[in-house]
């Protein structure tokens, strides 16, 4: 599984509806509205790097209101949530 973090700058008028539209895209596991230089952070989870390109270029970037994106591929995940699920004994 390939994970990518996508930072998104949006048109101000698109902010109220873009989060839901991003979350509904196939390949998008999570979408967050954030503070700072970017408006949204999207977590993409797909089988391979080609899938990341498909999601970012052909789905995310095609939504109305997207100004620009910045994509980072994850090398490793160190999420506490992931570790807890690995060692869970079902309680």
List each language-model region with its residue ranges:
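A compositional/biophysical signature of low hydrophobicity enriched in polar/charged and small residues
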Residues: 1-91
């Amino acid at each position: 599984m390939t994970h990518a973090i996508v930072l998104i700058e949006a048109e101000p008028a698109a902010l109220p509806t873009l989060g839901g539209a991003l979350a509904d895209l196939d390949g998008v596991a999570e979408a967050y509205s954030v503070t700072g230089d970017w408006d949204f952070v999207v977590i993409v989870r797909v089988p391979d790097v080609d899938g990341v390109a498909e999601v970012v270029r052909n789905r995310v970037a095609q939504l109305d209101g997207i100004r620009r994106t910045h994509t980072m591929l994850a090398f490793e995940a160190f999420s506490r949530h992931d570790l807890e699920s690995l060692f869970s004994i079902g309680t």
